[in-house]
Regions:
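Conserved small-residue
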Residues: 7-9, 27, 82, 103, ...
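Conserved beta-ketoacyl condensing-enzyme motif
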Residues: 7, 29-162, 191-199, 292-308
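ACP-dependent fatty acid/polyketide chain-elongation machinery
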Residues: 1-65, 89, 244-256, 347-361, ...
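Condensing-enzyme catalytic core mediating Claisen C-C bond formation in acyl metabolism
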Residues: 4-8, 31-36, 213-288, 297, ...
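Active-site-proximal alpha-helical scaffold in enzymes
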Residues: 78-91, 140-143, 148-151, 157-191, ...
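A glycine- and small-aliphatic-rich helix-loop capping segment at beta-alpha/alpha-beta transitions
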Residues: 21-28, 112-128, 177-180, 201-212, ...
Length: 409
């Protein structure tokens, strides 16, 4: 079986905005969502830079106290983005009760509830003091377990923990399940906590930018003077659906998923690889039946680290050198949204494709010997987009690439 897979709904909760229209405008304007959180320095961080993500307000009219008690920060973000996605897809509560829908979400940590539980045990020496919800908050699968129970989802249900490629792999696997006829509709996405507990060990690697005098200029993918990434987070949700199923229920189709590629570098745990990136991109193109010259835009993984950007630039130059595809990293505006990044960047890419523009790679002022070979969009470019490639790479050498297509009957 080889079914077409389309996207019928999207939702976003990020530092660029908490609805699709606001995020689209932020992308078009090249608006940064990065700021300072001084308590990070007090806690012992080298850098106070972070994406500033609005805290969701989930009232008792939306969810009862019992449910909210089991929801950590990242699950709350994902709940809000999934509400948006179901609404755009015109999937009602009644539809959810009467039809099987799956859920595959990317998430790779839930640090705050784990640390809070440890503090309570150290202080009180009594597990009864932990209360009801912390066990459900503490598991990597917390987003899936919350979404599946809140929305009464009865299809496939598991979490992808694949570092910073988690959100992208979730879309890829949802795509494969629908393509092969195993599911009709799958809620896919990624979520990332933003609390300062969650990123302390990342800061310890010296991977974060310390350009604290200019927060909005700190994330500068591919720029010669980049000094590290800026952590960020939130959630992104996408409704993937079999084309015939979507057509039969009169759904509005936003885009089509036509290719998914993956690979593993097989090297050092934090060592990027141009070869692994090329394999993932090549597989995605082959599955989609398109060539490198057919791609109009590439949403690069580039996080603003020296090695990561260098190796991706090498891979992109090998595959797309001399081709017309424009390249930018939306992380220049969002910072690195980690576990959600592959999903949020799919949303960002689709918003660009729907509105025929390429968001800029802001803060790119000086190329280095690798990025000077790339066709980077450093300002907003209005141009027709029919095929886009979105890259996501992560610790442990995991690589994912998605090819998304403007929908045509």
């Amino acid at each position: 079986m080889n079914r077409r897979v389309v996207i019928t709904g999207m939702g976003i909760w990020s530092c660029l905005g908490t609805d699709l229209e606001t995020v689209k405008q932020s992308l078009y304007e090249g608006k940064s969502g990065i700021g300072m959180q001084p308590e990070r320095l007090e806690y012992g961080y080298r850098s106070a830079l972070t994406g500033i993500v609005e805290e969701p307000v989930i009232t008792k009219k939306m969810l009862d106290r019992h449910t909210r008690a089991g929801m950590p920060e990242e699950a709350r973000y994902a709940y809000m983005s999934s509400l948006q996605a179901f609404e755009q897809a015109n999937i009602t509560d009644e539809y959810l009760r009467e039809n099987e829908i799956g859920c595959i979400f990317g998430n790779d940590s839930s640090a705050k509830p784990v640390i809070e539980a440890s503090k309570i045990m150290d202080e009180k020496h009594d597990s009864a003091m932990l209360g009801y919800g912390l066990i459900f908050q503490s598991m990597n699968s917390t987003v899936n377990m919350n979404l599946s129970t809140i929305f009464h989802l009865r299809g496939v249900n598991f979490t992808i923990s694949a570092a910073c490629a988690s959100g992208s792999h979730s879309i890829g696997l949802g795509y494969m399940l629908i393509k092969q006829g195993m599911q009709d509709v799958v809620l896919c996405g990624g979520a990332q906590e933003t609390n300062f507990y969650s990123m302390a060990s990342f800061d310890a690697l010296g991977a974060f930018s310390v350009r604290m005098d200019e927060p909005t200029k700190a994330s500068r993918p591919f720029d010669r003077d980049r000094d590290g990434l800026v952590p960020s987070g939130g959630a992104a949700s996408l409704i993937l659906e079999d084309y015939e199923h979507a057509k039969a229920r009169g759904a509005n189709i936003l885009a089509e998923v036509v290719g998914y590629g993956f690979s593993s570098n097989g090297g050092g745990i934090s060592q990027p690889s141009d070869e692994g990136s090329v394999v993932a991109m090549t597989r995605a193109l082959e599955m989609s039946g398109v060539k490198a010259e057919d791609i109009d835009y590439i949403n690069a993984h580039a996080t603003s680290t020296h090695q990561g950007d260098m190796y991706e630039a090498m891979a992109l130059s090998r595959m797309f050198g001399g081709k017309h595809a424009l390249i930018s990293s939306t992380k220049s505006m969002t910072g690195h949204e980690c576990w959600m990044a592959g999903a949020s960047e799919a949303v960002y890419s689709i918003l660009m494709m729907q509105n025929d523009f390429v968001a800029p790679n802001i803060n790119f002022e000086h190329p280095d010997e690798y990025s000077e070979k790339l066709n980077l969009a450093i300002t907003t470019v209005e141009t027709e987009l029919n095929l886009v490639l979105s890259n996501s790479f992560g610790f442990g050498g995991t690589n994912s690439a998605l090819v998304l297509k403007k929908f045509k009957e």
